[in-house]
C-alpha cells in the first residue's frame, strides 16, 4: 500500500512572521515563495500545516 502524499506551497512571505512559524515552514521543506514540497500525510505534518495555514496552500 502506497503512502498518501500532500503537496504544500508557500504562498505568503515569511517577513514579519514569528520565528517558530518560520522554523515550521522550513521543517515543511519550503524555502522561497511559491516553492512546493511533497510530504507524507501524517498527523505531525498535518499539525505543521495547520500551524502555518495562513502562509501555505495545500495543493493535493
Curated annotation (Swiss-Prot):
Alphabetical keyword list: Ribonucleoprotein, Ribosomal protein
Q: Name one GO cellular component term.
A: cytosolic large ribosomal subunit
Which Gene3D superfamilies does the record associate with it? Ribosomal protein L30, ferredoxin-like fold domain
Ribosomal protein among keywords: yes
Please name the GO terms of the biological process aspect recorded for this protein, alphabetically. Answer: translation
Q: Which InterPro entries match?
A: Ribo_uL30_ferredoxin-like_sf, Ribosomal_uL30_bac-type, Ribosomal_uL30_ferredoxin-like
The terms under GO molecular function for this entry are: structural constituent of ribosome
Subunit composition and interactions: Part of the 50S ribosomal subunit.
Similarity comment: family membership: Belongs to the universal ribosomal protein uL30 family.
The record's annotation in NCBIfam families points to: rpmD_bact (TIGR01308)
Name of this protein: Large ribosomal subunit protein uL30
Please give the organism: Ralstonia nicotianae (strain ATCC BAA-1114 / GMI1000) (Ralstonia solanacearum)
